[in-house]
């Protein structure tokens, strides 16, 4: 079965809350906050369906800098529930978000993932992403 990918709607808030909890742990995000985020329109949120069930999601953002001619994109989140993995959902989510980012004028897309997340790295590589040796630094404010 081929996954169906579409932009998330406010009707997906409940399943997005559940999937995000499976992915990130911590406290479940309230549906009202998810709906508010979906309504701002700043972030692309896509969902993948198999047999009419949402089984995964991915998020992307684009930004523009005077330093570069084209906008840059980033896939900021990607999760497919375990029972739906290896069925093409992640690749379909990537292709969908790449097309949406192209419409926004994005010329390059990056994805950050854990250094030892070999299944994700293999998926991204199979979709044409190239691994770079960069350091990620973070600071709490």
Which residues make up each language-model segment?
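Conserved acetyl-CoA pyrophosphate-binding loop and the N-cap/start of the following alpha-helix
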Residues: 84, 88-96
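Loop/helix-junction capping segments adjacent to catalytic residues or to phosphate/diphosphate-binding pockets
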Residues: 69, 87, 118
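Conserved active-site alpha-helix within GNAT-family acetyltransferase domains
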Residues: 91, 115-133, 139
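Conserved GNAT acetyl-CoA-binding A-motif
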Residues: 102-113
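Residue-level recognition of the GNAT/N-acetyltransferase active site
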Residues: 63, 81, 85, 114
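Acetyl-CoA-dependent GNAT
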Residues: 3, 7-70, 76, 94-96, ...
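Hydrophobic adenine-recognition pocket in adenosine-nucleotide-binding enzymes
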Residues: 8, 78-80, 113
């Amino acid at each position: 079965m081929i996954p169906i990918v579409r932009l998330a709607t406010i009707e997906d808030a409940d399943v997005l809350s559940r999937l995000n909890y499976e992915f990130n742990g911590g406290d479940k995000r309230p549906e009202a906050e998810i709906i508010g985020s979906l309504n701002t329109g700043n972030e692309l949120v896509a969902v993948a369906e198999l047999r009419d069930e949402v089984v995964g999601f991915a998020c992307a953002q684009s930004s523009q800098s005077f330093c570069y001619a084209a906008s840059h994109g980033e896939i900021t989140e990607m999760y497919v529930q375990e029972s739906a993995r290896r069925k093409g959902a992640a690749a379909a989510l990537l292709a969908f978000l790449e097309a949406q980012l192209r419409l926004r004028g994005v010329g390059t897309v990056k994805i950050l993932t854990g250094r030892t997340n070999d299944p994700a790295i293999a998926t991204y590589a199979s979709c044409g992403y190239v691994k770079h040796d960069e350091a990620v630094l973070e600071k709490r404010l």
